[in-house]
Amino acid sequence: AAVQPLSVSDAMGARVDAQAWRVDRLTKQFQAISDAADTSIGAAKSGGDIARHMLNSHLDDHWCPSKYHRCGNSPQCMSNMAFCDGVNDCKNHFDEDENRCVVPVTANSTWIGYPAYDHCTQRRPYEMVISITSAPSDIVYKVHQPLKVQVDLFSKKGGLKQSASLHGDAVYCKGSQRLIVAPPEDDRLEIIGQFDGVSNDRFKGYIVREMSGDKCAEFRFFKQ
């Protein structure tokens, strides 16, 4: 049978379909490039924030006296006790910044920690769980947030799994951004959780000898 030539309307329709396909393909390519750019920009911003924080932390260690912190990017140092007390002590008001004064260890929050090293605990736990059982919500302009905590320890002995549950008092210091758990046992080992000022969902937990202040174990905690 003879091939019938395309009508004008059919030819126009085919051309429109081809153009639509090309436009759709270009749109998808552009979106992919745009998404990749957004990801790169986001990573760069995040990396920049972390780099700035690391630099500031390094400067804090060498710039300000013990129990003092820099007022953000300012060279001014301020006592830990002046942070988040409702009074602007830093010239740039960094000490009362709403992000700086967040208390990440809220009531009913749970934090699971895994050992980086352990040279001193009795049980040598492979997992430690800190649960915040109570945190007063009416304390706004207080440098120290009092807490009640439960510490669950999971360990192994002779191939058998063991667990222990301890209860005690703790405090979150807004100035130093530290969670301090008083020694829950007679060995007088306290837990000091140090937040980095960037991520509120994790912290380094140090086991510290109460009398000397020496760190003898470290756990990495993550919010659940």
From Swiss-Prot:
Pfam families: Eryth_link_C. Coiled coil: none annotated. Keywords: Disulfide bond, Glycoprotein, Oxygen transport, Transport. GO terms for molecular function: oxygen carrier activity. Disulfide bonds join C64-C77, C71-C90, C84-C101. Residues 62-103 form the LDL-receptor class A domain. InterPro entries: Eryth_link_C, Eryth_link_C_sf, LDL_receptor-like_sf, LDLR_class-A_CS, LDrepeatLR_classA_rpt. SMART domains: LDLa. Gene3D superfamilies: 2.40.128.620. PROSITE patterns: LDLRA_1 (PS01209), LDLRA_2 (PS50068). Glycans are attached at N108. It comes from the Eukaryota. Acts as a linker for the assembly of heme-containing chains in the construction of giant hemoglobin. Giant hemoglobin is composed of four heme-containing chains (AI to AIV), and two linker chains (AV and AVI). This is Giant hemoglobin linker AV-1 chain. It comes from Lamellibrachia sp.
